[in-house]
Amino acid sequence: MAYLESAVVIYLRAMYGIENLLRDINFQPDAYTFIEIGREAATIIMLVTLSLISGNNWSKKIGYFFLSFGIWDIFYYIWLYVCIQWPKSLFEWDVLFLIPLPWWGPVIAPILVSVVLIFIGLLLIYDFKFKISSFDWIIFCLSIFMILYTFMDDSIKILLSGNGSLTEVRPTNFNWIIFLLSIIVWVVVTLKVSIPSIKQRGKSQN
């Protein structure tokens, strides 16, 4: 799936003559724009379907989704680099998604998210029981929300201000402080709720 994703993006770059995303990309809606949005939705549906048939309970189904999404996203960039030697840098800007708004971020940002998703996915797949409180859930969900916000920050600002069009969105800067703090909180909460189960699993095996 990662190779197919990268192949489609390579074709789109060639078709639109895109060498520099910030300079060359055109978000003016056309038939291909809606096809691309449909392709993004279809990719998520495929990952969800794979997860639903892989896990024998909801915890594992979610785990397989996190795992497959993380691996897919990382190998998407690996295949892009193998095929067209892009990105030149892990800090190069990329359009991550168009649903529900255009997402922008340095390449390393979604890769970091994918690494965390793989870690959480493995914990769920191997049936570690999370002892999570309501407060932990709130902090966990808030950290995810803030990560998503950093990706859609510019799109949200244009949408709320009413000045300009989403088709004109170009990233101005990436809020590394909010992003990294959210990643750290996400990891800390995950460790906090999973370490007791990991320790218990270790004791039972000794």
Where are these regions (language model features)?
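Interfacial segments of alpha-helical transmembrane regions
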Residues: 55-71, 131-142
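Membrane-interface interhelical connector segments
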Residues: 21, 82-101
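Juxtamembrane "helix-exit" motif on the non-cytosolic side of transmembrane helices
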Residues: 85-86, 125-127, 152-164
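Membrane-interface capping segments at transmembrane-helix boundaries
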Residues: 125-131, 189-205
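Membrane-interface loop-to-helix entry segments
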Residues: 27-49, 98-119, 171-180
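Transmembrane alpha-helix/helix-exit interface in multi-pass inner-membrane proteins
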Residues: 2-13, 70-89
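Perimembrane loop-to-helix junctions flanking transmembrane segments
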Residues: 16-32
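Hydrophobic core of alpha-helical transmembrane segments in multi-pass integral membrane proteins
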Residues: 44-50, 112-124, 140-155, 176-193
